[in-house]
Amino acid sequence: MKAEVIKLDASPAGSIELDDAIFGLEPRADILHRVVRWQRAKAQAGTHSVLGKSDVSYSTKKIYRQKGTGGARHGSKKAPIFRHGGVYKGPTPRSHAHDLNKKFRALGLKHALSSKATTGNLIVLEDIALAEGKTAMLAKAVKELGWKRVLVIDGADINENFAKAARNLEGVDVLPSIGANVYDILKRDTLVITKAGVEALEARLK
């Protein structure tokens, strides 16, 4: 498929041929869903924790005698049945990560790129070189281009001035091609890829 290439000042800069096997697939929600779940599960801290019976700070002394009180038989006040007692089978710190085949993850990335291309939310830039790393300059360019929530993917290395300018700009994320992932692509309304980024992604996913 053919895509128009523009510059940061919105002027045309020719066109580029995009690989249909990467940018021209029919997006499948089930594949995207599985990859996003894998990403978010891996990112989850898993630090949830509660105090169990052995963790609660109470005496282990039997609270009252076994027989003759008319009440139920109890031992320690740490039992889950009591207020401030330990929690029975509560959450403990653990990893939520699960495995997902490397080929499936690559397929998910292809479908994410294709979903932006098919909906017209993929823009190819010639490059993201800026003379100065000024946020005001980039903010003006982004406003004129009509970008609201945008992810910019560059080649192997991100232009230093562009990275500095975008760092303090709300709604603009910048990633190198190796950092391109399904979740970040779907999270933003517009996907912007430089020509160097397109070449790097096609080399990575072929």
Swiss-Prot record:
Gene: rplD
Protein name: Large ribosomal subunit protein uL4
Molecular-function annotations in GO: rRNA binding; structural constituent of ribosome
Disulfide bonds: none
Family: Belongs to the universal ribosomal protein uL4 family.
GO biological process: translation
Subunit structure, interactors included: Part of the 50S ribosomal subunit.
UniProt KW Lipid metabolism keyword: no
The organism of origin for this protein: Cereibacter sphaeroides (strain ATCC 17023 / DSM 158 / JCM 6121 / CCUG 31486 / LMG 2827 / NBRC 12203 / NCIMB 8253 / ATH 2.4.1.) (Rhodobacter sphaeroides)
GO cellular component assignments: ribonucleoprotein complex; ribosome
Pfam family, one: Ribosomal_L4
SUPFAM superfamilies: Ribosomal protein L4
